[in-house]
Curated annotation (Swiss-Prot):
It catalyses: UTP + L-glutamine + ATP + H2O = CTP + L-glutamate + ADP + phosphate + 2 H(+); L-glutamine + H2O = L-glutamate + NH4(+); UTP + NH4(+) + ATP = CTP + ADP + phosphate + 2 H(+). The active site is at C379, H512, E514. Pathway: Pyrimidine metabolism; CTP biosynthesis via de novo pathway; CTP from UDP: step 2/2. CTPSs have evolved a hybrid strategy for distinguishing between UTP and CTP. The overlapping regions of the product feedback inhibitory and substrate sites recognize a common feature in both compounds, the triphosphate moiety. To differentiate isosteric substrate and product pyrimidine rings, an additional pocket far from the expected kinase/ligase catalytic site, specifically recognizes the cytosine and ribose portions of the product inhibitor. This is CTP synthase. It comes from Rickettsia bellii (strain RML369-C).
């Protein structure tokens, strides 16, 4: 019998519902249960694929090509269970399906309403594709009281009534703000949040209280009294220095055991060895290595969430603290680049879209190459590395990408360039995914290359999100100038990896390795990149 756990939030957004859901799922997994995590987002976009990173943060790509919320990255990193298109839904996707069904006449002339038609689609999403799982954890985006979230709260309220307590549990995450002048945590916002949740028919079974310091027993008892919850089910969520400390903190407070007790399930011992190993490695990470990220959205770190985490994972692997140096690519010039990158041990250019800030990134590639600083280019980062090499090593001074320029030598071209049915005027928000290469694809690596040696195998599968590729017409001239093409798609039409073997570590990949990195299984390319940065640090 599958059991459903709904995680909601109140008081403020960005409290850590995703981390709480991921941590609990991992803890249940450690007790031998099979878990599934899902995110329900109340915004009207069909998916986050075309949303501005300033608005949404990173778009997390799954194996099956779904463009999803960044919280699914947390889910995968904590549990190791691959997410899929069935694990994320938005209000936009709900209404898109609803209107399609209505136009097809599938509602047989009924008045289509939020209740029951919208809520039924949400319920169907939650209850479908659950075979083989012991627990399905659903995170509801936003906070209680948000008008756009009401259909989702109504849907889970109905599920709670239909399944009863034997199959359904509600966890509510709130904030206990600390008022310095009063020198105490304030419980009133939590009381009001629970009250708001109850007005829509949901009574939380477990209350998780986020705070910046330890919560006193008297404060827990006060919260329990006014929120009508047993003190045993009021769980502290104290700020941690590292997100990978969160699961064991919840375990210490007994969150996993309280959930099993609620469902009247046997409380088995937890197998948490690999998480204890992570904690020990973090404690032993005294030395530092500095990695510069040449970013377009340097002020919004969530736009590069998986890259940040993948670097952290490599640091955990090597028992090194990875200090990130954020560089605004728009402000990089020939005159200031040496000052901006002074003292860094590695340079990373992440993926992205749009022309803005690309020339600054190209300058950073040049600085890494000419100073033999370890370099890692991902997706657009690889393409810009190819342009830098073309301009300054191969001699093609007018090298450009077709994505931004119509004039010049097009080192980077559109994947669909040779598709007979392709028409540039057809690229709209509605059909833009038709030109995008999304999801996992097999890559064949070249033996005795940096990339192949990192993986330890010649056939790999990695996730992609791009519509442009290296122009294979220039492969020969690049090779004559020392470039090694170390990875190709199965049909050999798409270059998947390039490298400069004579340098300490210079690798560009078309795919997104960061999406597959985990704290207990760091991605091999990030392991080798950070390893090269450590070596550079020791020698300079």
């Amino acid at each position: 019998m599958v059991r459903f756990i709904f995680i909601t939030g109140g008081v403020v957004s960005s409290l850590g519902k995703g981390l709480t859901a991921a941590s609990l799922a991992m803890l249940l997994q450690a007790k031998g249960f099979k878990v599934c995590l899902r995110k329900l987002d109340p915004y009207l976009n069909v998916d986050p694929g075309t949303m501005n990173p300033h608005q949404h943060g990173e778009v997390y790509v799954t194996d099956d090509g779904a463009e999803t919320d960044l919280d699914l990255g947390h889910y995968e990193r904590f549990t190791g269970v691959p997410a899929c298109k069935f694990d994320n839904i938005t209000t936009g996707a709900v209404y898109s399906k609803l209107l399609k069904e209505e136009r097809l006449g599938n509602y047989t002339g009924l008045t289509v309403q939020v209740i029951p038609h919208v809520t039924n689609i949400i319920k169907d999403f939650i209850l479908s594709n659950t075979k083989g799982f012991d627990f399905v954890l659903c995170e509801i985006g936003g906070t209680v009281g948000d008008i756009e979230g009401l259909p989702f709260f109504e849907a889970i309220r109905q599920i709670g009534n239909e399944l009863k307590s034997k199959q359904c549990l509600f966890i509510h995450l709130t904030l206990l703000p600390y008022v310095k002048t009063a020198r105490e945590l304030k419980t009133k916002p939590t009381q009001h949040s629970v009250k708001e949740l109850r007005t829509i028919g949901i009574s939380p079974n477990i209350l998780v209280c986020r705070a910046e310091r330890k919560i006193a027993k008297s404060e827990i008892e006060k919260i329990a009294l006014f929120c009508n919850i047993d003190p045993e089910y009021v769980i502290p969520a104290i700020d941690q220095k590292n997100i990978y400390l969160v699961p064991l903190a919840y375990h210490d407070y007994g969150l996993d055991n309280k959930v099993l007790k609620f469902f009247n399930l046997t409380i088995a011992p937890s197998k948490l060895n690999r998480w204890h190993d992570i904690i020990e490695r973090l404690k032993e990470s005294h030395s530092k290595v500095r990695i510069a990220i040449i970013a377009k959205y340097h002020k919004l770190k969530d736009a590069y969430k998986s890259v940040i985490e993948a670097l952290d994972h490599a640091g955990i692997y090597h028992k090194y603290k990875v200090d990130l140096v954020w560089i605004n690519a728009e402000n990089v010039t020939n005159e200031n680049i040496s000052k901006k990158l002074l003292g860094v041990d590695g340079i990373l250019v992440p993926g992205g879209f749009g022309e803005r800030a690309t020339e600054g990134k190209i300058l950073a590639v040049n600085y890494a190459r000419t100073n033999n600083i370890p370099f890692f280019g991902i997706c657009l980062g690889m393409q810009l590395a190819a342009i830098e090499i073309a301009r300054n090593l191969v001699g093609l001074k007018d090298a450009v990408t077709e994505e931004f320029k119509t004039a010049g030598t097009k080192i980077i071209e559109r994947i669909s360039k040779h598709d007979e049915d392709f028409n540039p005027s057809d690229i709209t928000i509605e059909n833009i995914k038709k030109t995008m290469r999304l999801g996992s694809y097999t890559c064949n690596l070249v033996s005795d290359s940096i990339t192949a040696n990192a993986y330890g195998e010649l056939k790999i599968s990695e996730r992609h999100r791009h519509r442009y590729k290296f122009n294979n017409d220039f492969q020969d001239i690049f090779e004559k100038n020392g470039v090694k093409f170390s990875g190709f798609s199965e049909d050999k039409k798409i270059v998947e990896a390039i490298e400069l073997p004579k340098l300490l570590w210079f690798v560009g990949v078309q795919f997104h390795p960061e999406f597959k990195s985990k704290p207990f299984e760091a991605h091999p390319l990030f392991i080798r990149f950070v390893e090269a940065a450590i070596k550079y640090n020791k020698n300079n």
